[in-house]
Amino acid sequence: AATAEFDAQSAGQSIVRGWNVKVFETETELLLREQSPSATTSSKPPAVSVKKPIERKAFFGDLHVHTTYSFDGYAFGTLATPYDAYRFARGEAIANPAGFNMQLTRPMDFYAVTDHAMFLGVVKAAADTSTQFSKNEFSAPYHGLNAPENMGAGLLSILNRLNTFSSFLSEAVMQTTSGKLDRDEVLGVVRSAWRDSIDAADQFNDPGRFTTFAAYEYTSSTADMGNLHRNVIFKGTGELPREPFSRFHSANPEDLWQWMDDLRAKGVESLAIPHNSNGSNGQMFKLADWAGDPLDEAYAAQRIRNEPIVEITQIKGTSETHPVLSSRDEWAGFEIMPYRIATSALSQMEGSYAREALLNGIALGQQGITNPYQFGFIGSSDTHSAASQNKESDFVSKLGLISSTGEQRGSLPQTGLSGEMSYLVLKALGRGNSRLR
């Protein structure tokens, strides 16, 4: 029945087109840490040499965290910076956009801020009228978006934010790709926010006690809105690229891997973590490369080298398996989000789930083809408020002002127009009929 529903919808629904326009030239020029104005080598704690433990240890953290630098995080009221995110992970209280405090009962062991590389820091810079970037015509609608008088969770505020968020990407992409919005100016904002995110990771890294990572999210999708997002995590911060590789460099994940390989040749080690393959419309683990050619040894080696981990659970659903793919598993339907990201279009099941990918990889190996799907698993939050809640009793979801109450998330009856509107907003953002708890 689920397969029939997908086929019927695919035949009858107009699919939103993705953006595959190359805007920025790919580069691997390194940003030396001493060039960063707020980085001081004297403030960094010394490296700690730790013997490999005889027994394995479990460490808990989050490698998928958004702050005020992500365009969607800022649009939904997030003011928390990467510095605030690391304070939260270490056990301090930080403010939710709705005004209440968020705090862990037990600090985390590791944390990585992974703001979207595409338009990194751009909405924040557009809204802040003290910045040079805010002076361009494009920025005017965003002026004062998160000023104190606009930080309510009422109906008008939610409608305004929905309108801002829904129009931002299409308008920003159109103006950037056409050249109407100065590309160098956009790139300048991105590079500045990237340096600040690195500095925050440096400031809070405490070897042997609390580990931070310089990181970001690569946000790509196929033409039919199949999700191909990855979080890119760097091993160190001594030398890093001047700018993160984004879909404005290429929408092809294989080009991301090549960029990572080129940086690796310069001594810069990293890994990419795919997430929400459940919304990839069969593209994340398909048995063909980006061009549609059969998988070969070079593809397998490059994917294994760059993507040793897959995120299989987060707020936008699980990516382990689906009831159609695992009919004898009574838990296969747990936290399923069956839609492509940011649409109401169903996602094809085959090629979208990790357990099936493992089986397909084993089958390839039995055919004498190197298995490209050799990976471990991780769970993350994808919070967009800088705070990763890990207790169901203290959970406020991920979208700031539009998901801060039980009514808005749909876990309590919507007794007012504001709560119902927020729930409809969540559905419009691709959460389908799922209730965010």
Explain the meaning of each model-derived region:
Residues 2-4:
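Short, aromatic- and glycine-rich surface loops/edge beta-strands on solvent-exposed regions
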Residues 6-7, 12-437:
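Extended, charged catalytic domains and RNA/DNA-binding interfaces, predominantly
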